[in-house]
Structures are given as structure tokens and as C-alpha cells.
UniProtKB/Swiss-Prot annotation:
Entry's Gene Ontology BP terms: threonine biosynthetic process
Reactions listed under catalytic activity: L-homoserine + ATP = O-phospho-L-homoserine + ADP + H(+)
Pathway stated in the Swiss-Prot or TrEMBL entry: Amino-acid biosynthesis; L-threonine biosynthesis; L-threonine from L-aspartate: step 4/5
Name this protein carries in UniProt: Homoserine kinase
Gene name as annotated: thrB
Amino acid sequence: MIIKVPASTANLGPGFDSIGMAVSLYLEVEVLSVSDRFQVDHVIPKIPHDETNLIVKTALTVYPGLQPLHLRVKNDIPLAHGLGSSSSAIAAGIELADHFGKLGLSDEEKVQIGARIEGHPDNIAPTILGGLVVGTEVDQHFDAIKAPLPPYTLVAYVPDYNLATKDARKVLPKELDFKTATHGSAIANTLVASLFTQNYKMAGELMESDVFHEPYREKLVPELNQIREVAHQKHAVATYLSGAGSTVMTWIEDEHVRGFLSGLNKHGLKANTFILHPDKNGVQIIE
């Protein structure tokens, strides 16, 4: 049995801690056998191989009676780069617990569990449900609604440096003045409306109009504005900081991808790039 979990791109500019989309990079967890102890085989530096691994830790949180398993992990999702790697591990752990504990969890219950662990639904909801998802938390209950899937290619520019979410949050202000907060909220509200009505020209403009986090984080990811400038020249829909960064994500029509990549190269932007697409399925079990 293999659990296949997509990566995710979150915030989409002003949809801070609320909007996210599953994308076509994957974490795969293969169950090799029952064992006398938890063993997680992988080649990722500084990630535990025992029950302290986030996948196993999550599974045991959901189902403490889980029998020890020998697992093999294949991961294509860059860690600490704003592509939801921790949410993907958490989703895999929930699925592991649900399957072997015979819990019969619904997708909605899985989202509740994952969002409680994460603290917000922007990555975990699309990772579980697939597609583009808008979510929030009210009175410790998480709501998530799927929007239409955008018809674009995604180009993820992944700088060589990591940027942990906790470090990226340190640069955010503790408070926003009322005028800024209401303006930011109006931008986010209109972004949601444009995504659901598939008005992507408007959505692109709004994705690049955030006041909640990008103005404070752009100094941590200096490539953001450079890439956005190239993207505008190459007819892209929008460019934004994926999650907390350091990945910069661009929505673009497939016919313009080659020119965009060439433009990045000409501007000396030569870090790894991934050509991705929205993932509509979310977490899957492959028998």
C-alpha cells in the first residue's frame, strides 16, 4: 500500500492562512510490513527514522493503538520552502491511522484533525481534499470550501535557502491598524469572489495586492519582485510568495512558460524551478 500526498501552495497573496491549492509534487509513503518497532526509511537529512518522524507521530496522535510499521518514504517536496511539506506529512499520518485503525474518517473529519495540528487550514485542506480550497476557523471548528480549479500551469521558483514558517512569522507585525486591516480584508474577499467566478484577470491583480504578509516578508525573499517583473513581461496571471516562502509561485498559461523560464535565466534567476499543475485529487491510497 502506498499513500500519495500532494504538496500545496498557500496564501495566494492576501488569502493569508486561508486559501491554498494542491499541486503536483508528491510525498509517497509505502507500507512495507508490520514490525516490532516503527522504522521509516528515507534519504532526507535531519528527518527522524523512528516514531518521532512527523508521519508516525501524527498517526499515533490520531490512533494511539497503531501497530509498529516499516515504512519507506519517497519525497519530491522541498522542505521548509513554502510548499506545505509538513502538511503533506501530517495528511499521510492521518491516512495511515485511518486505514490501519479502521477509523472510517470522512474527509471533513480528516481536515478537522489536520487543521487542529497545523493551526490553520490553508495547506492541510487542499492536501486532503485536492484542488483550490478556501478555509477558516471559527470557535475551534474549521470550514473548507473547494473553488473551481484554475486552468493554468504553475511555475515554482525554489531558492537554494530554506525559510522556516516560524522564522518568516517573526517579521510580521503583531497588530495592523484598522484601516489597513479592513482594506486587506476587502482585497481578500474580492479575491475569493473572483476565484469562484473564474475571473482570473481580476484574481491575478488581487493576488499581487496583499497587505497582510508579503510587504514584510519580501525582504526575506528578494527574488519575489524580480520574478514578478519578469512574469508581467511574459503575460503571467500572477506571482506571489508561496506560503511563508522561500518558493515564489507564478500562474501562467502553458504557451508562455518557455519564455518565462528564459526571462528568469536572463535576469540571473537560476535556482531550481518546477513546472507544476493543480492536483484535483488530494491524498490517495494506491493498493
